[in-house]
A protein has these predicted regions:
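Hydrophobic, proline/glycine-rich low-complexity stretches
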Residues: 1-4
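C-terminal catalytic domain of Rieske-type non-heme iron oxygenases
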Residues: 38, 112-353
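A short, aromatic/hydrophobic, helix- or strand-capping loop or linear motif
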Residues: 6, 10, 57, 103, ...
Length: 353
């Protein structure tokens, strides 16, 4: 995972002159935005006495530690120690490359030189973006698998906006092919064809009620992750304004409702019936949460009984398994290529909820 760029935070949620703690992939970092607006990711603790740097103060383009005032520049070099006469060149924090685009802050958290940033052309242009970053209380890999699982719509989401789109009236015919970027999966239910891309190692691209959607599932730790979701809509000025207003209104209703994760957990514990959530504004997340939380903290894959409808899951696991085997053997894993013009061509129509 650390060999790739990953989103780590929503751009709109980080003000200039602000530092805050960040936990991604089981590791703690400091995330900040300088006064000029540049987002940075660096080590979480001061070199002096180990205080969290997220409690410090952003001064121009540098960060001053809250405890004894040690100051660090964008390269991680300590530029000031107020109580000391000198500031050796060797005093350096580790910093991580960042790139900000499509409403998200991306970081490369691996060793060595960062690879080229992947093209995100399908999310860029004259359209409008809507970004969401929900925290999910289960393993990120489980969510990736669920996003490729077409059959679960017929059962998990039988009461949902998908029902209005003919998604549950018949089981899908499935095709899944390996590509230079990961997998291309097509499902067909009568006249409805739905295309979904899986881009290695943890991203899904689809059409979601008329908008292009790309989601990155980034682990916080083994039992939770953030689903960084970018929806992009092109159209007339009025169409874009209406769509954006609708998304914001839905987001406001979700924010005012009980958190989807808590509702899902209560259903799994037997405290609520599934039907009690039918009017929740984030119903799809509640339903997926029930299905995924009910698998347990760590799903038991050794005893799975997979079938032909799980072809997407089998192929995706094989891609991961091959890369991990190469790394274990000291071999260079496959270079995955995200095409600049990769666009999903079929999906849910615009009339969904």
């Amino acid at each position: 995972m650390r060999r790739f760029w990953h989103p780590v935070f929503a751009s709109a949620q980080l003000d200039a002159g602000r530092a805050r703690p960040l936990r991604i992939m089981g590791q703690d970092f400091t995330l900040l935005r300088t006064q000029s607006g540049r987002a940075q990711v660096l080590a979480d603790r001061c070199l002096h006495r180990g205080t969290l740097l997220s409690t410090g103060t952003v001064e121009g383009e540098q960060l001053r530690c809250f405890y004894h005032g040690w100051k660090y520049d964008p390269s991680g070099r300590c530029t000031e120690r107020p109580a000391e006469r000198t500031c050796p060149e060797s005093l350096r924090l580790r910093t991580y490359p960042t790139h900000e685009t499509v409403g998200l802050i991306f970081a490369y958290l691996g060793d060595g030189e960062a690879p080229p940033f992947p093209p995100l052309d399908p999310l860029q242009g004259d359209g409008v973006l809507f970004v969401e970053t929900p925290l999910r209380p289960f393993n990120y890999f489980r969510q990736i698998e669920n996003a490729l699982d077409e059959v679960h719509f017929n059962f998990v989401h039988r009461v949902s906006p998908f029902a209005d789109q003919g998604m549950i009236t018949e089981l899908p015919e499935l095709r899944c092919e390996e590509t230079e970027f990961g997998l291309s999966r097509i499902s067909k239910r009568g006249s409805i064809e739905r295309q979904t891309y899986f881009l290695m190692p943890n991203s899904n691209a689809s059409l979601f009620f008329g908008a292009r959607r790309q989601v990155w599932r980034v682990p916080i730790d083994d039992t939770s992750h953030i689903s960084f979701t970018v929806d992009y809509l092109e159209g007339t000025t009025d169409e874009k304004a209406e769509w954006l207003a609708g998304r914001r209104e839905t987001a406001a209703r979700i924010a005012a409702a009980p958190p989807a994760a808590e509702v899902s957990a209560a259903i799994v514990r037997g405290e609520l019936p599934v039907e009690s959530a039918k009017d929740h504004p984030d119903l799809l997340s509640v339903q997926d949460g029930v299905a995924l939380l009910a698998q347990g903290v760590c799903a038991d894959r050794e005893n799975e009984a997979l079938g032909l409808s799980d072809i997407h899951l089998v192929k995706m696991r094989r891609l991961w398994s091959q890369d991990l085997s190469d790394l274990d053997a000291g071999r260079e894993p496959r270079k995955w290529l995200w095409p600049a013009k990769l666009k999903v061509t079929s999906g849910l129509p615009e009339t969904g909820g």
